[in-house]
Amino acid sequence: MKIGIIGAINQETERLKKIIHFYIEKKINTYKIYIGKFKSHDVFLIKSGIGKVSASVATMILIDLYKPDTIINSGSAGSLQSFLKIGDIIIPKKTCYYDVDLTNFGYTRGQIPGYPKEFTVNEKICNFFKKNADKYQLKYIKGLILSGDTFVRENESIKILKKQFPSAIAVEMESSAIAQVCYKFNIPLIIIKSISDESDNNATVNFKENIDFVSYQLSKFVKIILENLIDM
């Protein structure tokens, strides 16, 4: 199986590199790609950079050059719910943009014309972790994760997002863009996130303090996914 993995920043990809065997590094423009193996899987890890456009380009590079059977988006996220704490791992079932608004044309908030109102992720992976939530100490696997080109860092912003998207559990800057490209090319997507901050007035400080730990947590769960992907 060919698996693409997308991480946005150095801390995330450096940890993920450690679980790939015999990798070589390739560079496409400013994008670094690490090509290697995990057991029988061919793995293609790319550092996308931050934000929706960068993530979309990285996803397209993976699809165009390596034609992965599945793509995994691994990264940090800010919590939007009090029951999610720093370090918790979440595997959301769906994602959408919070900074898209064409409601005046009859679309749902967050919906791009020609696309569903929310992008869904690989159902098998959700079912696997639902069955094994206690075993892997997963805090929460259902719900919606939001994406937009802002690092959410204010209490007032949380109130607005929760009002507009009541089912949202977390927010970040890449997953919906990756999901849109995967949807277009019919590539199954797995999203795995770890909470780095609570999206509040302390979010910037908390993110800086926790990103290394969060990246370590993520690498452990990506490894679990790779070990079980065929059975899923």
Curated annotation (Swiss-Prot):
Gene3D superfamilies according to UniProt: Nucleoside phosphorylase domain
Keywords of the record: Amino-acid biosynthesis, Hydrolase, Methionine biosynthesis
Family: Belongs to the PNP/UDP phosphorylase family. MtnN subfamily.
Disulfide bonds: none
One GO biological process term: L-methionine salvage from methylthioadenosine
Binding site for substrate: G78, V152, M173, E174
Protein name listed in UniProt: 5'-methylthioadenosine/S-adenosylhomocysteine nucleosidase
GO MF term (any one): adenosylhomocysteine nucleosidase activity
Record note on quaternary structure: Homodimer.
Class in the EC hierarchy, top level: hydrolase
Gene Ontology CC terms, in alphabetical order: cytosol
Gene label: mtnN
SUPFAM superfamilies: Purine and uridine phosphorylases (SSF53167)
Listed pathway(s): Amino-acid biosynthesis; L-methionine biosynthesis via salvage pathway; S-methyl-5-thio-alpha-D-ribose 1-phosphate from S-methyl-5'-thioadenosine (hydrolase route): step 1/2
InterPro entries: MTA_SAH_Nsdase, Nucleoside_phosphorylase_d, Nucleoside_phosphorylase_sf
Highest taxon in the source lineage: Bacteria
Annotated Pfam families: PNP_UDP_1 (PF01048)
Record's keyword annotation contains DNA damage: no
